[in-house]
Amino acid sequence: MINPNNRTMLVDGDILLYVCSTQMEEPIKWDEDTWTLHASERKTIDKFADTITYYSQILLCNNIAIALSSKTNFRKKISPLYKYGRRNNRKPLTFAPLREWVKKNFKTYEMPYLEGDDVLGILATSDMIKGDKVILTKDKDMKTVPSTIWFMQGDDYTIVDEDTANYNHMIQTLTGD
């Protein structure tokens, strides 16, 4: 039987921040030639909070830990071309203020030079957080971590044992993913 008081939802914060802030952007056409985007910071915060509540109820988790990416990244030190193709992609309008709100209102984990999914892997496999843990993400790369995962786009758990996680990691390594 699942004990919600001994169960933590490990949230892929980067993905959830991006999804919520993108969903709340609204385009407005002012005239034949002028478009703008606007977003309500309050509505974006409410969307994020509602999403956390929704999944914590489904997953029976009373504890929430949100993993965030560091501003610095060791992969960029190794290869300056890492995610180079994304350099011109803008962040959604309310991404930065939502991130700050999340840091003030939830238990967040951020580690120097690591991305949020790296932090999720550490939290899922270490004793930093006690009890049962469920990763909430959309990122298929989490299948390289021995853990219990709930993919936001699905409706069931994925349980990844250590052998399967190692296999998935090697496949990604060999295919350059």
Q: What residue spans do the PLM features occupy?
A:
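Domain-level signal for Mg2+-assisted phosphodiester chemistry and nucleotide/NA-binding surfaces
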Residues: 1-100
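Extended two-metal-dependent nuclease catalytic cores across DNA- and RNA-processing enzymes
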Residues: 2-6, 34-35, 61, 85-177
